[in-house]
Amino acid sequence: MSWWQVISLAVVQGLTEFLPVSSSGHLAVVSRVFFSDDAGASFTAVTQLGTEAAVLVYFARDIVRILRAWFDGLVVKSHRNADYRLGWYVIIGTIPICVLGLLFKDEIRSGVRNLWVVATALVVFSGVIALAEYLGRQSRHVEQLTWRDGLVVGVAQTLALVPGVSRSGSTISAGLFLGLDRELAARFGFLLAIPAVFASGLFSLPDAFHPVTEGMSATGPQLLVATLIAFVVGLAAVSWFLRFLLRHSMYWFVGYRVVVGVVVLILLATGTVAAT
């Protein structure tokens, strides 16, 4: 990979990881349209370490508070508060994607990164997001979360294994369907992603160096720079997105997804861009 490719894709990763537009889908599209080859699932997973580090920084106080409450609750039963329970919900919600990610890792690295799949997912799942916005009551708050909410949102997170769906899009939509307010759905989804994304990034790190494995290859320095860029851009993106959700719905992103998906489908149908 050239440095221009690395920097461009890292910026795309940082900008799109937390928005309901699918970072992996955008990386696949940008790679094929502008650089004629897919960066690969491993490059995506490794650069996601940068954006998840941004989540750690942004939610540092929340994470420390939840961890303290969780460990404290394990020792003293009377100290089991909402933060203690939230820690368990994150653990419960992480299980589905870890299991499916391991079972279908080969398919994730190859077949589902086909641009026909990506473009179709962008369009189809935009309908799910719109429906969640329309039906969501947004009346439940963090004190009302249950383990079932953690499991449902965790199952929804597995949909993000398909490029074009979007991790934040699937988890926020699930939260809205469950009646959570929009900001809580986003925050819970971002916290839920931390264990799975870090595990995926570390697991994929060796593969990202080898062109024989998939897509384009990157050197160690390139991966480091890409991860740092994704961190900086991602930190700005998550801060902006959560402020955005306080006053706006996700309908803006629904329209964007449909436009991008349709454009990619046209490019594929006319043979302008190769699907794989």
From Swiss-Prot:
One of its GO terms (biological process) is cell wall organization. It catalyses: di-trans,octa-cis-undecaprenyl diphosphate + H2O = di-trans,octa-cis-undecaprenyl phosphate + phosphate + H(+). It is a multi-pass membrane protein. InterPro entries: UppP. GO terms for cellular component: plasma membrane. It is an enzyme of class 3 (hydrolase). GO terms for molecular function: undecaprenyl-diphosphatase activity. It comes from the Bacteria. The keyword Ligase does not apply. Its EC number is 3.6.1.27. Pfam families: BacA. Keywords: Antibiotic resistance, Cell membrane, Cell shape, Cell wall biogenesis/degradation, Hydrolase, Membrane, Peptidoglycan synthesis, Transmembrane, Transmembrane helix. Its main location: membrane. It is found in: Cell membrane. The chain crosses the membrane at residues 84-104, 115-135, 188-208, 222-242, 250-270. NCBIfam families: PRK00281.2-1 (NF001392), undec_PP_bacA (TIGR00753). Catalyzes the dephosphorylation of undecaprenyl diphosphate (UPP). Confers resistance to bacitracin. Bacitracin is thought to be involved in the inhibition of peptidoglycan synthesis by sequestering undecaprenyl diphosphate, thereby reducing the pool of lipid carrier available. Belongs to the UppP family. This is Undecaprenyl-diphosphatase. It comes from Mycobacterium ulcerans (strain Agy99). The gene is uppP.
